[in-house]
Amino acid sequence: MKQYKLVNNVLGWLTFLVAAFVYCSTIEPTASFWDCPEFITTGYKLEVGHPPGAPFFMLTANLFSQFASDPTQVAKMVNTMSALLSATTILFLFWSITHLARKLILKDWSEMTMGKLIAIEASGLVGALIYTFSDTFWFSAVEGEVYAYSSAFTAIVFWLILKWEDHADEPHSDRWLVLIAYMTGLSIGVHLLNLLCIPAIVLVYCYRRYPHIELKGSLLALLASFVIVAGVLYGVVPGIITVAGWFELLFVNQLGCPFNTGEIVYIILLVAIVIWAIYESYTDRNFKRQNLSFVLSVGMLGVPFRGMGWGAAIVGIIILAAIYFGLNYRKKIDKQFVPVVSARFKNTALLCACLCL
């Protein structure tokens, strides 16, 4: 096992070096004639790009632009960032391929032989290097666009769920899921494309937790993943702004407070309620209080609120009520009533939501 990990790590970094050398040798020396000049300029000057924006890309592009000796080299530095991030994509793609190949070839570590080791590593090398020199990926790797960055996040997030799959039976395995949520939150600051990893993550989670799952269960898991994607895309991302706007209108227009008072109150309440919910789900002492704090957290995050006005508020409250009654549902197992949604699941979901923000 140790020998495999050593070889796997060495060859993974070798593919990274090959990809980094190729991409850095073939980068655009200046700006390409499409969105790239906009991203390079907004990164260099920390300006606002076109909607929905890419703030995390701008910050890291600005960091790389500091290495430019003069303004004429800024574009080259940002293009170099894309090249290195694309090489990072190849690195994690290699490790993902070898992980999946190992699952196909080996049932147990005791079955490892030199021939199987070569087959696993060769699979990773062939797959990673084919992708390295593919036309579409190479094209995006050498210019200052968000797609190279987004690809790196996608590769890292998928590799992380495979790492979780290796450690799923350990007591603290949920930390990998929390890290995935954090990386997904960062990726939203680059491009929303990374949300498409969620269906794959949910399927890996379900197949690992429920190895005998059938077609119906797989379809339900896939449907749940679509709900999560929609919840993040149409719930959390615009929902926080919606609820914060309601607080601001209440405190400024109705109560006559100074500007930003409602926003400050909202942030304080949001942090306090989420911390309370995390504490309740962690201690698992009071079932009713645990569910109430969880539902309040979901509401404060704005997940069920879509649109503006009384209609959006009423629909959101109905959804929150349905979530609350769903959390209170228990099923009978071995003459005991057990909650369908465990405290551990709620705690992990809250931590993931916080880090995703």
Positions of PLM-derived features:
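Membrane-interface transmembrane helices that cradle and orient dolichyl/undecaprenyl
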Residues: 114, 118, 157-176, 203-214, ...
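Aromatic- and kink-enriched transmembrane "portal" helix at the membrane-lumen/periplasm boundary
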Residues: 24, 71-79, 104-120, 124-151, ...
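Transmembrane-embedded, aromatic-rich helix segments that form part
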Residues: 153, 193-205, 238-240, 312-319
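Short hydrophobic alpha-helices at membrane interfaces in multi-pass membrane enzymes
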Residues: 122-125, 167-185, 214-227, 289-297
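Start-transfer (signal-anchor) and selected internal transmembrane alpha helices
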Residues: 1-22, 88, 108-125, 324-357
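Transmembrane-helix motifs of polytopic, lipid-linked glycan transferases
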Residues: 13, 80-112, 156-160
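Short hydrophobic/aromatic helix or loop-helix immediately within or flanking a transmembrane segment
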Residues: 45, 50-76, 80-84, 91
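Membrane-interfacial entry segments at the cytosolic side of transmembrane helices
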Residues: 172, 211-223, 255-265, 283-295, ...
